[in-house]
């Protein structure tokens, strides 16, 4: 009896060891091997390149944040800054400009204009290239020269646009709060703001060249992130009755913002892969009568990936520029009180479902036009496939491929832009319905830009890591394809 009990206990412990401790030991060994590969990667050339780019990016961002709070030289004592901040802290237009400039607008800092003039100039030149066939032809035929020329033209346009914006801000925003305003003080402010925008442009270009991601997008991302503490302080300092229903409403609003983040990431990463047949590969298979399974065909299959949202977050930025910047500026500054135009614009319910509907339509229209003019050209796609002797199965080369890709882009873009617009207007609808204070940091444009930069930075870091990353699958352990053209040739 005792021997049976001892044998049973031994069997139980052996089972526990085989089922629990042995797999855990194996997992520890695998983790140790992965850690060694990670340490090897830390010493690799690719990660060394990432470290250099990351350090360069952080140093340039540090310069931007310092310049954000530097006052305009020689003008610190000539402005009633406290009154300027109090009167404009509840102005929606001023809050948006302050958000995109990282707090420099309400501080009347050296970098008040921020990166907006450079982004406007780049976008204007992109649209102009697609509108004028001569510019598009010049860009295709002389790519390197065109790239240098476009870069130069973008800088010139940035200076012109920054000068115009500086005049508007100086004479409309700053002048009423100046203690001793004269022409020379205004000229000094205009020159300082223009120079600040040029310095921001240079830093953004350097981040793009030696940093981790696009400099313009990264600077706006940093400015948005920098306003998070102020937005939280604004929320708690507002006159809110912190009851259970209000706390529940706030949690619901935050949950909708997180849902917006996940949906935007999904839209940016989703799409439809379309298989492409390359004539040379098919000819080799037919020449050697090579049998191929469906699994092997999937591994070697070439695809064209049509994104669900080819225009990205640009439609949201464009719509926000119209309804949050252009219209308020036009209403508040270009029209006089009591004018019939002022009363007409004021009669439109821009803070209701009508604005949300206009927002949705604008995003969808701009997304459709931007996708076909800036991002993807179906005619160029068809010409490239034809030059590579490739075709889409079931679609003839040439005009049919152009029509097919056009229709596919329209369908995917309609779905993606509609979902994007719906997700962007949903938080504002909930805020108005529940009476929550509006936080600029949780606005659709803020979330879209932040996530767009995060996704782009992740892609670039992954591309820099390359094949040396220990987290990628080891291609040497995959089963090789059952193809050997050399043996077939020798046999023949």
Swiss-Prot record:
SUPFAM superfamilies: Preprotein translocase SecY subunit (SSF103491). Residues 471-484 have a biased composition (Basic and acidic residues). Keywords: Cyanelle, Membrane, Plastid, Plastid inner membrane, Protein transport, Thylakoid, Translocation, Transmembrane, Transmembrane helix, Transport. GO terms for biological process: protein transport. It is found in: Plastid, Cyanelle thylakoid membrane; Plastid, Cyanelle inner membrane. The keyword Protein transport applies. HAMAP family: SecY. The central subunit of the protein translocation channel SecYE. Consists of two halves formed by TMs 1-5 and 6-10. These two domains form a lateral gate at the front which open onto the bilayer between TMs 2 and 7, and are clamped together by SecE at the back. The channel is closed by both a pore ring composed of hydrophobic SecY resides and a short helix (helix 2A) on the extracellular side of the membrane which forms a plug. The keyword Transmembrane helix applies. Its main location: plastid. Pfam families: SecY. It is a multi-pass membrane protein. Belongs to the SecY/SEC61-alpha family. The gene is secY. Residues 468-492 are annotated as: Disordered. GO terms for cellular component: cyanelle inner membrane; cyanelle thylakoid membrane. InterPro entries: SecY (IPR026593), SecY/SEC61-alpha (IPR002208), SecY_CS (IPR030659), SecY_dom_sf (IPR023201). It comes from Cyanophora paradoxa. It comes from the Eukaryota. Coiled coil: none annotated. This is Protein translocase subunit SecY.
